Swiss-Prot record:
The keyword Ribonucleoprotein applies. One of its GO terms (molecular function) is structural constituent of ribosome. Pfam families: Ribosomal_L32p. This is Large ribosomal subunit protein bL32. Residues 1-19 have a biased composition (Basic residues). Keywords: Ribonucleoprotein, Ribosomal protein. Transmembrane segments: none annotated. Belongs to the bacterial ribosomal protein bL32 family. The keyword Ribosomal protein applies. GO terms for biological process: translation. GO terms for cellular component: large ribosomal subunit. It comes from Clavibacter michiganensis subsp. michiganensis (strain NCPPB 382). The lineage of its organism: Bacteria, Bacillati, Actinomycetota, Actinomycetes, Micrococcales. Residues 1-21 are annotated as: Disordered.
Length: 67
């Protein structure tokens, strides 16, 4: 196992850790039933009826799963 030669200072430790940050997800704007909906690209979406009841999941215009 690798062992550091010298103790790493608090500022250097924090500077290194500051590079580990989460990115905001990429969202795609679509219009469904007259409403603007933001969703993640390349994901199956849930198709709902007018009452909001989930019917099935769809990907690239094809039904892929029942909900």
């Amino acid at each position: 196992m690798a062992v550091p030669k010298r103790k790493m200072s608090r500022s250097n430790t924090r500077a290194r850790r500051s590079q580990w940050k989460a990115e905001a997800p990429t969202l795609v704007k679509t219009i469904e039933n007259g409403k603007v909906v933001y969703s993640m690209p390349h994901r199956a979406r849930v198709v709902e009826d007018a009452a909001g009841t989930p019917l099935y999941m769809e990907y690239k215009g094809r039904k892929v799963a029942d909900v």
